[in-house]
Amino acid sequence: MEFHFFGTGSGVPSIERNVSACAVRFLQQRGKQWLFDCGEATQHQILRSSIALGKIERIFITHLHGDHIFGLPGLLGSRSFQGGENPLFLYGPKGIRSFVETALQVSNTHVKYELTIEEFSEPGLLFHEEGFKVETILLDHVMPCYAFKVTEDDRPGELLVDRLKAKGVPPGPLYRKIQQGETVELPTGERLEANAFLGPPKRGRSFVLAGDTRPVKELIPFAKNVNVLIHEATFLDDKKGHAHEYGHSTMADAIQLAKQANVDHLILTHISSRYHDMSDELQKKAQNAFANAVVAHDFYVFHLPLAKG
Protein backbone atom coordinates (compact mmCIF):
# COMPACT_ATOMS: atom_id res chain seq x y z
CA MET A 1 0.00 0.00 0.00
CA GLU A 2 1.45 3.35 -1.07
CA PHE A 3 0.38 6.85 -0.05
CA HIS A 4 1.23 9.56 -2.59
CA PHE A 5 0.93 13.15 -1.37
CA PHE A 6 0.23 15.66 -4.15
CA GLY A 7 -0.80 18.63 -2.02
CA THR A 8 0.32 19.26 1.55
CA GLY A 9 -0.41 22.96 1.97
CA SER A 10 -3.41 24.78 3.40
CA GLY A 11 -5.79 27.29 1.90
CA VAL A 12 -4.04 28.36 -1.29
CA PRO A 13 -1.15 26.95 -3.34
CA SER A 14 2.36 28.10 -2.53
CA ILE A 15 5.70 27.64 -4.24
CA GLU A 16 6.56 24.78 -1.87
CA ARG A 17 3.18 23.13 -1.38
CA ASN A 18 0.10 22.59 -3.51
CA VAL A 19 -3.35 22.25 -1.92
CA SER A 20 -4.85 19.04 -0.57
CA ALA A 21 -4.70 15.74 -2.44
CA CYS A 22 -3.48 12.26 -1.53
CA ALA A 23 -3.64 9.08 -3.61
CA VAL A 24 -3.46 5.55 -2.26
CA ARG A 25 -2.30 2.65 -4.42
CA PHE A 26 -3.17 -0.87 -3.29
CA LEU A 27 -0.35 -2.98 -4.68
CA GLN A 28 -1.81 -6.34 -3.64
CA GLN A 29 -5.19 -5.54 -5.22
CA ARG A 30 -4.12 -5.26 -8.89
CA GLY A 31 -2.70 -1.82 -8.17
CA LYS A 32 -6.08 -0.12 -7.74
CA GLN A 33 -5.83 3.58 -6.98
CA TRP A 34 -8.01 5.87 -4.86
CA LEU A 35 -7.78 9.63 -4.45
CA PHE A 36 -8.60 11.61 -1.31
CA ASP A 37 -9.43 15.29 -1.93
CA CYS A 38 -8.62 17.08 -5.14
CA GLY A 39 -7.38 20.61 -4.75
CA GLU A 40 -6.51 22.88 -7.65
CA ALA A 41 -3.83 21.47 -10.02
CA THR A 42 -4.03 17.95 -8.60
CA GLN A 43 -4.07 16.47 -12.11
CA HIS A 44 -0.88 18.38 -12.92
CA GLN A 45 0.79 16.97 -9.79
CA ILE A 46 -0.31 13.46 -10.77
CA LEU A 47 1.47 13.85 -14.12
CA ARG A 48 4.74 14.12 -12.20
CA SER A 49 4.15 10.85 -10.34
CA SER A 50 3.72 7.13 -10.98
CA ILE A 51 -0.03 7.35 -10.33
CA ALA A 52 -2.14 6.95 -13.48
CA LEU A 53 -5.16 9.21 -13.66
CA GLY A 54 -7.01 6.71 -15.84
CA LYS A 55 -6.64 4.02 -13.18
CA ILE A 56 -8.15 5.97 -10.30
CA GLU A 57 -11.34 4.11 -9.38
CA ARG A 58 -12.67 6.06 -6.40
CA ILE A 59 -12.39 9.66 -5.19
CA PHE A 60 -13.24 10.69 -1.63
CA ILE A 61 -13.85 14.33 -0.68
CA THR A 62 -13.58 15.39 2.97
CA HIS A 63 -15.41 18.73 2.57
CA LEU A 64 -16.34 21.37 0.04
CA HIS A 65 -13.77 24.11 0.64
CA GLY A 66 -12.08 25.12 -2.59
CA ASP A 67 -8.61 23.93 -1.62
CA HIS A 68 -10.04 20.40 -1.48
CA ILE A 69 -12.30 20.35 -4.58
CA PHE A 70 -11.30 22.96 -7.17
CA GLY A 71 -9.20 20.39 -9.03
CA LEU A 72 -12.12 18.02 -9.59
CA PRO A 73 -13.71 19.34 -12.82
CA GLY A 74 -10.46 19.36 -14.75
CA LEU A 75 -9.36 16.00 -13.42
CA LEU A 76 -12.68 14.35 -14.26
CA GLY A 77 -12.57 15.75 -17.78
CA SER A 78 -8.94 14.79 -18.40
CA ARG A 79 -9.48 11.24 -17.15
CA SER A 80 -11.34 10.43 -20.37
CA PHE A 81 -8.24 11.31 -22.39
CA GLN A 82 -5.85 9.27 -20.25
CA GLY A 83 -7.30 5.80 -20.64
CA GLY A 84 -10.01 6.22 -18.04
CA GLU A 85 -12.80 4.11 -19.48
CA ASN A 86 -13.68 2.13 -16.36
CA PRO A 87 -16.36 3.46 -13.96
CA LEU A 88 -15.43 6.08 -11.38
CA PHE A 89 -17.09 6.52 -7.99
CA LEU A 90 -17.02 9.91 -6.29
CA TYR A 91 -17.99 10.24 -2.61
CA GLY A 92 -18.48 13.49 -0.75
CA PRO A 93 -20.70 15.61 1.48
CA LYS A 94 -23.99 17.02 0.25
CA GLY A 95 -23.31 19.60 -2.43
CA ILE A 96 -20.56 17.70 -4.24
CA ARG A 97 -23.00 16.47 -6.90
CA SER A 98 -24.23 19.99 -7.66
CA PHE A 99 -20.67 21.34 -7.82
CA VAL A 100 -19.43 18.66 -10.22
CA GLU A 101 -22.49 18.52 -12.46
CA THR A 102 -22.68 22.31 -12.77
CA ALA A 103 -18.97 22.62 -13.61
CA LEU A 104 -19.17 19.89 -16.26
CA GLN A 105 -22.39 21.26 -17.74
CA VAL A 106 -21.30 24.91 -17.92
CA SER A 107 -17.95 23.95 -19.49
CA ASN A 108 -19.65 21.50 -21.88
CA THR A 109 -17.39 18.73 -20.60
CA HIS A 110 -18.52 15.18 -21.40
CA VAL A 111 -16.88 12.27 -19.62
CA LYS A 112 -16.63 9.01 -21.55
CA TYR A 113 -16.95 6.75 -18.54
CA GLU A 114 -19.66 5.99 -16.02
CA LEU A 115 -19.44 8.54 -13.19
CA THR A 116 -21.34 7.71 -10.01
CA ILE A 117 -21.60 10.45 -7.39
CA GLU A 118 -22.64 9.41 -3.89
CA GLU A 119 -23.36 12.09 -1.31
CA PHE A 120 -23.41 11.38 2.41
CA SER A 121 -24.36 13.38 5.47
CA GLU A 122 -24.62 10.79 8.21
CA PRO A 123 -21.40 9.27 9.57
CA GLY A 124 -21.02 5.51 9.45
CA LEU A 125 -20.33 2.76 6.92
CA LEU A 126 -19.85 4.05 3.38
CA PHE A 127 -19.30 0.63 1.80
CA HIS A 128 -17.70 -2.76 2.39
CA GLU A 129 -16.63 -4.45 -0.83
CA GLU A 130 -13.61 -5.60 -2.82
CA GLY A 131 -11.78 -6.48 0.39
CA PHE A 132 -12.11 -3.07 2.06
CA LYS A 133 -14.43 -1.35 4.50
CA VAL A 134 -14.73 2.44 4.37
CA GLU A 135 -16.29 4.39 7.23
CA THR A 136 -16.78 8.10 7.90
CA ILE A 137 -17.01 10.30 10.97
CA LEU A 138 -18.03 13.95 11.24
CA LEU A 139 -15.27 16.33 12.32
CA ASP A 140 -15.36 19.85 13.78
CA HIS A 141 -14.64 22.40 11.07
CA VAL A 142 -16.40 25.59 9.95
CA MET A 143 -18.46 23.53 7.49
CA PRO A 144 -19.39 19.82 7.39
CA CYS A 145 -16.12 17.91 7.12
CA TYR A 146 -15.34 14.22 7.50
CA ALA A 147 -12.61 11.70 8.17
CA PHE A 148 -12.39 8.44 6.25
CA LYS A 149 -11.29 5.15 7.79
CA VAL A 150 -10.22 2.41 5.40
CA THR A 151 -9.83 -1.10 6.79
CA GLU A 152 -8.50 -3.99 4.75
CA ASP A 153 -10.17 -7.36 5.31
CA ASP A 154 -8.13 -9.83 7.34
CA ARG A 155 -6.16 -12.37 5.32
CA PRO A 156 -6.18 -16.12 6.02
CA GLY A 157 -3.48 -17.36 8.38
CA GLU A 158 -0.50 -19.50 7.47
CA LEU A 159 -1.26 -22.93 6.06
CA LEU A 160 -0.52 -25.63 8.67
CA VAL A 161 1.19 -28.02 6.27
CA ASP A 162 2.28 -30.54 8.91
CA ARG A 163 -1.30 -30.95 10.05
CA LEU A 164 -2.45 -31.58 6.47
CA LYS A 165 0.32 -34.10 5.86
CA ALA A 166 -0.71 -35.91 9.03
CA LYS A 167 -4.13 -36.27 7.43
CA GLY A 168 -2.51 -37.74 4.35
CA VAL A 169 -3.21 -34.73 2.16
CA PRO A 170 -0.39 -34.26 -0.38
CA PRO A 171 0.64 -30.81 -1.65
CA GLY A 172 -1.52 -29.68 -4.54
CA PRO A 173 -4.76 -27.91 -5.44
CA LEU A 174 -6.39 -28.76 -2.09
CA TYR A 175 -3.72 -26.76 -0.28
CA ARG A 176 -4.59 -23.70 -2.33
CA LYS A 177 -8.31 -24.08 -1.67
CA ILE A 178 -7.75 -24.41 2.07
CA GLN A 179 -5.41 -21.41 2.00
CA GLN A 180 -8.30 -19.46 0.46
CA GLY A 181 -10.59 -20.51 3.29
CA GLU A 182 -12.57 -23.16 1.43
CA THR A 183 -13.89 -26.41 2.91
CA VAL A 184 -12.56 -29.35 0.89
CA GLU A 185 -13.59 -32.98 0.55
CA LEU A 186 -11.08 -35.84 0.40
CA PRO A 187 -11.51 -38.88 -1.87
CA THR A 188 -12.52 -40.79 1.27
CA GLY A 189 -15.48 -38.44 1.69
CA GLU A 190 -14.01 -36.73 4.75
CA ARG A 191 -14.57 -32.97 4.79
CA LEU A 192 -11.82 -30.69 6.02
CA GLU A 193 -12.77 -27.29 7.40
CA ALA A 194 -10.20 -24.69 6.38
CA ASN A 195 -10.08 -23.08 9.82
CA ALA A 196 -8.67 -26.29 11.31
CA PHE A 197 -5.63 -26.08 9.03
CA LEU A 198 -4.89 -22.37 9.12
CA GLY A 199 -3.08 -20.29 11.69
CA PRO A 200 -4.56 -17.10 13.16
CA PRO A 201 -5.87 -14.62 10.56
CA LYS A 202 -3.46 -11.91 9.49
CA ARG A 203 -4.82 -8.52 10.44
CA GLY A 204 -5.67 -6.26 7.54
CA ARG A 205 -4.05 -2.86 7.28
CA SER A 206 -5.95 0.29 8.15
CA PHE A 207 -5.63 4.03 7.89
CA VAL A 208 -7.57 7.17 8.76
CA LEU A 209 -7.42 10.29 6.64
CA ALA A 210 -8.98 13.26 8.40
CA GLY A 211 -10.07 16.47 6.75
CA ASP A 212 -9.78 19.92 8.31
CA THR A 213 -10.77 19.92 11.97
CA ARG A 214 -10.36 21.26 15.44
CA PRO A 215 -9.40 18.57 17.97
CA VAL A 216 -12.37 16.20 18.29
CA LYS A 217 -12.47 13.44 20.90
CA GLU A 218 -14.55 11.13 18.70
CA LEU A 219 -11.50 10.66 16.48
CA ILE A 220 -9.70 8.76 19.24
CA PRO A 221 -11.81 5.56 19.09
CA PHE A 222 -12.28 6.00 15.33
CA ALA A 223 -8.52 5.94 14.73
CA LYS A 224 -7.71 3.46 17.51
CA ASN A 225 -4.76 1.22 16.59
CA VAL A 226 -4.75 2.09 12.88
CA ASN A 227 -1.50 1.69 11.00
CA VAL A 228 -1.52 5.21 9.56
CA LEU A 229 -3.20 8.44 10.67
CA ILE A 230 -3.10 11.31 8.17
CA HIS A 231 -4.02 14.49 9.99
CA GLU A 232 -3.76 18.22 9.45
CA ALA A 233 -1.21 20.31 11.33
CA THR A 234 -1.96 23.73 9.90
CA PHE A 235 -0.21 25.65 12.68
CA LEU A 236 2.32 25.21 15.46
CA ASP A 237 1.15 25.40 19.05
CA ASP A 238 1.87 29.12 19.50
CA LYS A 239 -1.05 29.69 17.09
CA LYS A 240 -3.39 27.31 18.91
CA GLY A 241 -6.12 29.89 19.53
CA HIS A 242 -6.02 31.05 15.93
CA ALA A 243 -6.09 27.46 14.67
CA HIS A 244 -9.12 26.47 16.72
CA GLU A 245 -10.97 29.69 15.88
CA TYR A 246 -10.79 28.84 12.18
CA GLY A 247 -11.52 25.13 12.56
CA HIS A 248 -7.99 23.76 12.40
CA SER A 249 -5.49 21.81 14.50
CA THR A 250 -1.93 22.38 15.58
CA MET A 251 0.91 19.91 15.28
CA ALA A 252 0.64 19.27 19.03
CA ASP A 253 -3.10 18.55 18.67
CA ALA A 254 -2.43 15.93 16.00
CA ILE A 255 0.40 14.31 17.96
CA GLN A 256 -1.73 14.09 21.09
CA LEU A 257 -4.45 12.35 19.08
CA ALA A 258 -1.93 9.91 17.58
CA LYS A 259 -0.72 8.97 21.05
CA GLN A 260 -4.22 8.62 22.49
CA ALA A 261 -5.31 6.47 19.55
CA ASN A 262 -2.12 4.37 19.66
CA VAL A 263 -1.50 4.65 15.92
CA ASP A 264 1.61 3.19 14.31
CA HIS A 265 2.45 6.09 12.00
CA LEU A 266 1.39 9.74 11.91
CA ILE A 267 1.62 11.75 8.70
CA LEU A 268 1.09 15.49 9.11
CA THR A 269 -0.17 17.63 6.25
CA HIS A 270 -2.16 20.81 5.44
CA ILE A 271 0.77 22.98 6.53
CA SER A 272 0.34 26.76 6.57
CA SER A 273 2.46 28.73 4.09
CA ARG A 274 3.75 30.81 7.01
CA TYR A 275 6.15 27.91 7.67
CA HIS A 276 7.90 28.09 4.28
CA ASP A 277 11.53 26.96 4.27
CA MET A 278 10.99 25.25 7.63
CA SER A 279 10.51 21.62 6.53
CA ASP A 280 13.51 20.28 8.46
CA GLU A 281 12.56 22.17 11.60
CA LEU A 282 8.95 20.97 11.42
CA GLN A 283 10.07 17.37 10.89
CA LYS A 284 12.44 17.50 13.86
CA LYS A 285 9.78 19.01 16.10
CA ALA A 286 7.23 16.35 15.10
CA GLN A 287 9.62 13.42 15.44
CA ASN A 288 10.84 14.54 18.85
CA ALA A 289 7.26 14.33 20.09
CA PHE A 290 6.20 11.18 18.19
CA ALA A 291 8.90 8.89 16.83
CA ASN A 292 6.93 7.66 13.81
CA ALA A 293 5.75 11.09 12.71
CA VAL A 294 6.41 12.55 9.27
CA VAL A 295 5.63 16.04 8.02
CA ALA A 296 4.63 15.28 4.45
CA HIS A 297 5.80 17.35 1.51
CA ASP A 298 4.50 17.35 -2.03
CA PHE A 299 5.41 14.08 -3.82
CA TYR A 300 6.25 12.34 -0.56
CA VAL A 301 5.44 8.61 -0.80
CA PHE A 302 4.84 6.45 2.27
CA HIS A 303 4.94 2.65 1.95
CA LEU A 304 2.87 0.46 4.26
CA PRO A 305 3.78 -3.24 3.85
CA LEU A 306 1.48 -6.16 4.47
CA ALA A 307 1.07 -7.06 8.12
CA LYS A 308 3.12 -10.09 9.12
CA GLY A 309 0.79 -11.37 11.79
Swiss-Prot record:
EC number: 3.1.26.11
Subunit field text: Homodimer.
Protein's UniProt name: Ribonuclease Z
Entry keyword set: Endonuclease, Hydrolase, Metal-binding, Nuclease, tRNA processing, Zinc
Named cofactor requirement(s): Zn(2+)
Top-tier EC class: hydrolase
Residues at the catalytic site: 67
InterPro entries referenced in this protein's UniProt entry, alphabetically: Metallo-B-lactamas (IPR001279), RibonucZ/Hydroxyglut_hydro (IPR036866), RNase_Z/BN (IPR013471)
Reaction equation(s) it catalyzes: Endonucleolytic cleavage of RNA, removing extra 3' nucleotides from tRNA precursor, generating 3' termini of tRNAs. A 3'-hydroxy group is left at the tRNA terminus and a 5'-phosphoryl group is left at the trailer molecule
Family: Belongs to the RNase Z family.
Matching Pfam families: Lactamase_B, Lactamase_B_2
Gene: rnz
Binding residue positions for Zn(2+) 2: 67-68, 212, 270
Keyword tRNA processing belongs to the record: yes
Cofactor, how bound (note): Binds 2 Zn(2+) ions.
Binding site for Zn(2+) 1: 63, 65, 141, 212
Role noted for this protein: Zinc phosphodiesterase, which displays some tRNA 3'-processing endonuclease activity. Probably involved in tRNA maturation, by removing a 3'-trailer from precursor tRNA.
GO MF annotation list: 3'-tRNA processing endoribonuclease activity; zinc ion binding
